[in-house]
Structure formats: C-alpha cells, structure tokens
C-alpha cells in the first residue's frame, strides 16, 4: 500500500486506490505525501478506498524552514520517503519516535549524496533526525550509477526504484552485499512500477546485480489500482 500511495502521489492527474491498508504507518506516509504536494481523499462509502491527486511534479519541501516529515515509528515510511523526497526540491526534515533515531540509514544517504542531495544528520551520525537539501536526483553526477548494499534492508533499493522515474536520466543501481534482505518486497515495488507504466531492466552480473530504470515520462495516474499489501 505504501508503494501505490507513493506512485499515485507522484503521478500527474488523479488515481483511485482500493483496499489500501489501514495502519498508523500508512497514515504517516499519506500525511508526508500530502504535505509535499499531493491530495488524498477517502472514497465515499468504501473502506480503504482513496482518490489521490498527484503533485504534478516533484515533492515540494520548504525554502527557509524545512518541511517536517514525521515518520513516527514507521521504518518503511522513513526509508522509502527519504529516497523519494530527495528527488524533490527544497528542505525536508525527516524525524520520528526515539527508536527511529537509533536506526542507521547511511547506506541509503550515501547513494543520495552521490546523486546530488545534501544530507545533514542532526544528532547521531548516520541516523534520523536528518535534514535533506534536495534539488532533484542527478545520475550524471556519478556516471549514471550508484552502488547500494542489500545486507541491511531491501527498502533502500525500493526507495531508489520509486524515486528514479523523477530523475532526468536513467539510473543504474549496482547491488552489493553478502545477502539480500527481504528481496520479495522488491518484487512488490517492481510490480507497482509496472502497474504505473514505468519501464525497467534487471541484469545479473557478478558480484552484484545492476538495475537500470528507463524513465519514459515519469509516473502516470492510474484509473484504479488494488495494492497487494
């Protein structure tokens, strides 16, 4: 459900989502997406139904004052939206409950810095709360590719997958590490990309498996979608 809410929020136009899970984590994701420019309204008489009007562009942060992005205790919201917001413009402050401020996120932020995002950690190194100064992801800064370890979380990769269609050029992500944590969830992300008409290519090479996005105009609105979970 997180992925489809994000896709619909990034799309141009209006989408309808059905059977969206009802949870505090999803509430956090929706609230941040709306604060960044999307509009989400419950469908009358339908539990889990939402009409989503996209941002018509990129996530919009603050200019002088950062946009507050409170993830509470949702690690999924934190990891997916840190990448997505980095593809936007402006200042974003990502923070949450105390336990979230003990979870490192540096594997992802290193990749975002390589793509042009300024990251500043406010307290503990490599953990939220953190400040993003975003000007859109720029694959050309790093030769069109970044390397990402999969040992800690597959959601770093999913976040980049969701953010990549907003980039002005194809992005290749070279996957590394000794193991891939929760790889089936990457499959959910790829399925979401397919539903929204985003093309991609997966190649397997030793020792890692690069992935390349082929943006064809970015996110497009869906008339209707039913998230897998």
Question: Where in this protein do the model-derived segments appear?
Answer:
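Structural preference for solvent-exposed beta-strand-turn elements
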Residues: 1-229
């Amino acid at each position: 459900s997180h992925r489809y809410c994000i896709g619909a929020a990034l799309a141009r136009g209006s989408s309808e989502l059905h059977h969206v899970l009802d949870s505090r984590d999803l509430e956090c994701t929706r609230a941040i997406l709306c604060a960044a420019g999307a509009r989400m309204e419950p469908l009358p008489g339908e539990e889990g139904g939402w009409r989503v009007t996209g941002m018509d562009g990129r996530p919009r942060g603050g200019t002088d004052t950062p946009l507050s992005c409170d993830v509470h205790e949702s690690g999924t919201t934190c990891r997916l939206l840190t990448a997505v917001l980095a593809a936007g413009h402006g200042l974003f402050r990502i923070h949450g409950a105390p336990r979230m401020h003990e979870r490192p996120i540096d594997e992802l932020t290193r990749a975002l810095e390589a793509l042009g995002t300024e990251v500043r950690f406010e307290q503990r190194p490599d953990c939220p709360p953190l400040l993003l100064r975003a000007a859109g992801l720029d694959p050309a800064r790093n030769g069109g590719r970044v390397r990402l370890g999969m040992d800690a979380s597959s959601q770093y990769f999913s976040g980049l997958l969701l953010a990549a269609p907003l980039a002005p050029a194809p992005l290749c992500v070279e996957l590394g590490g000794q193991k891939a944590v929760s790889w089936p969830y990457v499959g959910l992300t790829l399925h979401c990309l397919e539903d929204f008409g985003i093309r991609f290519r997966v190649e397997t090479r030793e020792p890692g498996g690069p992935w390349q996005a082929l943006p064809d105009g970015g996110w497009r609105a869906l008339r209707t979608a039913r998230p897998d979970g």
